[in-house]
Amino acid sequence: MSNASKFGKVAVLFGGKSAERDVSLDSGQAVLDALLRSGVQAEAFDPKERSVTELVGYDRAFIVLHGRGGEDGQIQGVLEWLDIPYTGTGVQGSAIGMDKIKTKQIWQGSDLPTAPYRIVSKDSDLNEIVASLGLPVIIKPVHEGSSIGMSKVEKIEDFAPAIEKATAHDAIVMAEKWITGREYTIVVLNGKALPVIRLQPPQDVAFYDYDAKYQRNDVQYGIPSGLSDSDEKKLQELTLRAFHTVGASGWGRVDAMQDEHGNFWLLEINTVPGMTSHSLVPKAAQAIGIDFDALCVEILAQTLTGLAH
């Protein structure tokens, strides 16, 4: 890339200590390689291996840390304290986006449609939860990404093992109403919603889980999504409202469902989405003619324009 020197010395932050470390290592290496190919003076920086105080001396940071510590406002706060511009969402938006319940509360308060939920524990009145949400439900740790610790529950006796599995990853666990229909993901880049992607996991997968996201090669990605032009536009507009309402900025991804009646339901937001070979952000960018190297440079360039922090 011409004029790559304007970025100065760039720390590509990846790895970290969260349950998503392995995904972050793959994503971060891909981003690092892309920036180096583009002539950027980029270096790997793993906060698990090095003290964040060593970030002094870098001119800006490209955050590719997934999950807690990297996607929840912590590293963003450190970078602001060090006065280092960084990619993506700021401290508050990151903290909200990492918390599925806070995200839903803000969406609900803004009259945005999101799947109904309840906080659950091993002591919860399961009959009351089933009466409220119906069956099936999906059990989720509130502060994990990449579908880690998630389970589909189809009968009441399946609650206990599902809650136990989720509790292994997070002290706070939620049950979310199962939306029967089609799953979509929408990438936001520089204030615009990119073409909607339809996710079609294989028949033997209950939902778009960790294996489907990162291990399997038989997941189908629909670009174009198959939605009508009006529904595509409606979902893109809904995504932008959802993205900005939680205080997200720069780049990210919103997951949504369309139920059997054609209604859209917001599920969650990812403020530092995956950038692996299986990941959805590169697929959406490719659909509008932005290759991976150009995508990484465009995200980094947000640190120059005020679109990021």
Curated annotation (Swiss-Prot):
<dbReference type="InterPro" id="IPR000291">
    <property type="entry name" value="D-Ala_lig_Van_CS"/>
</dbReference>
<dbReference type="InterPro" id="IPR011127">
    <property type="entry name" value="Dala_Dala_lig_N"/>
</dbReference>
<dbReference type="GO" id="GO:0005524">
    <property type="term" value="F:ATP binding"/>
</dbReference>
<keyword id="KW-0573">Peptidoglycan synthesis</keyword>
<dbReference type="GO" id="GO:0008716">
    <property type="term" value="F:D-alanine-D-alanine ligase activity"/>
</dbReference>
<keyword id="KW-0133">Cell shape</keyword>
<feature type="binding site">
    <location>
        <position position="255"/>
    </location>
    <ligand>
        <name>Mg(2+) 1</name>
    </ligand>
</feature>
<feature type="binding site">
    <location>
        <position position="268"/>
    </location>
    <ligand>
        <name>Mg(2+) 2</name>
    </ligand>
</feature>
<keyword id="KW-0436">Ligase</keyword>
<protein>
    <recommendedName>
        <fullName>D-alanine--D-alanine ligase</fullName>
        <ecNumber>6.3.2.4</ecNumber>
    </recommendedName>
</protein>
<dbReference type="GO" id="GO:0046872">
    <property type="term" value="F:metal ion binding"/>
</dbReference>
<dbReference type="InterPro" id="IPR016185">
    <property type="entry name" value="PreATP-grasp_dom_sf"/>
</dbReference>
<comment type="function">
    <text>Cell wall formation.</text>
</comment>
<keyword id="KW-0067">ATP-binding</keyword>
<dbReference type="GO" id="GO:0005829">
    <property type="term" value="C:cytosol"/>
</dbReference>
<dbReference type="Pfam" id="PF01820">
    <property type="entry name" value="Dala_Dala_lig_N"/>
</dbReference>
<comment type="similarity">
    <text>Belongs to the D-alanine--D-alanine ligase family.</text>
</comment>
<keyword id="KW-0460">Magnesium</keyword>
<feature type="binding site">
    <location>
        <begin position="130"/>
        <end position="185"/>
    </location>
    <ligand>
        <name>ATP</name>
    </ligand>
</feature>
<comment type="pathway">
    <text>Cell wall biogenesis; peptidoglycan biosynthesis.</text>
</comment>
<dbReference type="InterPro" id="IPR011095">
    <property type="entry name" value="Dala_Dala_lig_C"/>
</dbReference>
<keyword id="KW-0963">Cytoplasm</keyword>
<keyword id="KW-0961">Cell wall biogenesis/degradation</keyword>
<dbReference type="GO" id="GO:0071555">
    <property type="term" value="P:cell wall organization"/>
</dbReference>
<keyword id="KW-0464">Manganese</keyword>
<keyword id="KW-0547">Nucleotide-binding</keyword>
<dbReference type="InterPro" id="IPR005905">
    <property type="entry name" value="D_ala_D_ala"/>
</dbReference>
<feature type="binding site">
    <location>
        <position position="268"/>
    </location>
    <ligand>
        <name>Mg(2+) 1</name>
    </ligand>
</feature>
<feature type="domain" description="ATP-grasp">
    <location>
        <begin position="104"/>
        <end position="301"/>
    </location>
</feature>
<dbReference type="GO" id="GO:0009252">
    <property type="term" value="P:peptidoglycan biosynthetic process"/>
</dbReference>
<dbReference type="Pfam" id="PF07478">
    <property type="entry name" value="Dala_Dala_lig_C"/>
</dbReference>
<feature type="binding site">
    <location>
        <position position="270"/>
    </location>
    <ligand>
        <name>Mg(2+) 2</name>
    </ligand>
</feature>
<dbReference type="InterPro" id="IPR011761">
    <property type="entry name" value="ATP-grasp"/>
</dbReference>
<keyword id="KW-0479">Metal-binding</keyword>
<dbReference type="GO" id="GO:0008360">
    <property type="term" value="P:regulation of cell shape"/>
</dbReference>
